[in-house]
């Protein structure tokens, strides 16, 4: 038997396998061409772009806010500098010029560092020590200067209204008393009705009964003194005395005799005029 006479049937399942593979393959998604873009990928890219844009805007806003804060700090520093007295201002300007010269020298000798003009951080590694000291001195001088008082400034912020001992309380009393009593010259009616009476009442609220009696006794002394002064003023105006008497009446001048021609003479005067003859001794015989 030769090999040529034998028939070998070689089973081949390639077609069936391929067919089965195509039939079994299931893809619910749409078939995309080579130039089409996946919608999910596109949405993801849009979200990332939005996040990047929001981040960029936030950084830009933070940078603008930081620049604005620096400008405000510079402006406040200049305002505080303008409020300083002339002597302190000259000293600070002199120190600033000296520090500028030192910083220039530092640049020449290796760039030891000059602080950035727009840098207002508390500490800068590149800031010159002299310039840092100048800033500290300027801040201390501005802080020590008394702020200008306005009508809206609370009185509690004034050092005078922060007494801690007897001397400071007496100074407060004298200062406030003198300042308030001057208002009586402008309007005595408003001073009495809208200030003095109500102020005394308000100041007496925290006092104890014993201290209130002291206040009343003090006011009684003031009342008696005022009554005495007013009585003396009335008597002085009327020409009386300080003790309350009416005073001595002025003596009336004596009446001068009328020596004119119309004055009537009596009988004795007629005798002087020679109307009666001289009597002799024989007339009485």
UniProtKB/Swiss-Prot annotation:
Q: Which HAMAP family match?
A: eIF3j (MF_03009)
What Pfam families does this protein's entry cite?
eIF3_subunit
Q: Which gene encodes it?
A: HCR1
Q: Where in the cell is it found?
A: Cytoplasm
Q: What name does this protein carry?
A: Eukaryotic translation initiation factor 3 subunit J
Q: What family is it from?
A: Belongs to the eIF-3 subunit J family.
Chain segments carrying region Disordered: 1-86, 232-285
Matches recorded under Gene3D superfamilies? Eukaryotic translation initiation factor 3 like domains
Q: Which residues form a coiled coil?
A: 36-81
Q: GO biological process annotations for this chain's record?
A: formation of cytoplasmic translation initiation complex; maturation of SSU-rRNA from tricistronic rRNA transcript (SSU-rRNA, 5.8S rRNA, LSU-rRNA); nuclear-transcribed mRNA catabolic process, nonsense-mediated decay; translational initiation
Identify the keywords attached in UniProt to this record, alphabetized: Coiled coil, Cytoplasm, Initiation factor, Protein biosynthesis
Q: Which residue windows does the record flag with biased composition (Basic and acidic residues)?
A: 42-86
- InterPro entries in UniProt: eIF3-like_dom_sf, eIF3j
What function does the entry list? Component of the eukaryotic translation initiation factor 3 (eIF-3) complex, which is involved in protein synthesis of a specialized repertoire of mRNAs and, together with other initiation factors, stimulates binding of mRNA and methionyl-tRNAi to the 40S ribosome. The eIF-3 complex specifically targets and initiates translation of a subset of mRNAs involved in cell proliferation.
Q: Name one GO molecular function term.
A: translation initiation factor activity
Assembly, per entry: Component of the eukaryotic translation initiation factor 3 (eIF-3) complex.
Q: What do the Gene Ontology cellular component annotations say?
A: eukaryotic 43S preinitiation complex; eukaryotic 48S preinitiation complex; eukaryotic translation initiation factor 3 complex
Q: Cite the record's Acidic residues compositional bias ranges.
A: 22-41, 269-285
Report if keyword Iron is assigned. Answer: no
């Amino acid at each position: 038997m030769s090999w040529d006479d034998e028939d070998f049937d070689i089973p081949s399942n390639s077609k069936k396998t391929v067919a089965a593979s195509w039939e079994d393959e299931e893809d619910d998604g749409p078939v995309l061409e080579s130039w089409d873009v996946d919608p999910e990928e596109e949405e993801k890219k849009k979200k990332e772009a939005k996040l990047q844009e929001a981040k960029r805007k936030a950084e830009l806003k933070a940078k603008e806010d930081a620049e604005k804060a620096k400008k405000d700090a510079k402006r406040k520093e200049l305002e505080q500098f303008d409020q300083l007295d002339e002597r302190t201002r000259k000293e600070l300007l002199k120190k600033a010029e000296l520090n500028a010269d030192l910083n220039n020298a530092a640049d020449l000798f290796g760039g030891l560092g000059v602080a950035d003009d727009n840098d207002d951080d508390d500490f800068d590694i590149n800031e010159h020590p002299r310039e840092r000291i100048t800033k500290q001195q300027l801040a201390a001088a501005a802080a020590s200067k008394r702020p200008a008082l306005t009508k809206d400034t609370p009185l509690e912020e004034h050092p005078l209204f922060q007494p801690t001992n007897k001397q400071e309380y007496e100074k407060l009393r004298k200062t406030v008393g003198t300042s308030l009593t001057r208002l009586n010259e402008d309007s005595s009616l408003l001073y009495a009705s809208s200030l003095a009476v109500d102020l005394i009442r308000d100041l007496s609220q925290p006092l104890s009964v014993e201290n209130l009696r002291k206040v009343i006794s003090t006011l009684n002394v003031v009342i008696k003194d005022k009554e005495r002064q007013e009585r003396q003023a009335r008597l002085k105006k009327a020409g009386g005395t300080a003790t309350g008497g009416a005073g001595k009446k002025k003596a009336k001048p004596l009446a001068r005799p009328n020596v004119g021609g119309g004055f009537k003479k009596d009988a004795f005067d007629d005798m002087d005029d020679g109307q009666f003859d001289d009597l002799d001794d024989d007339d009485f015989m």
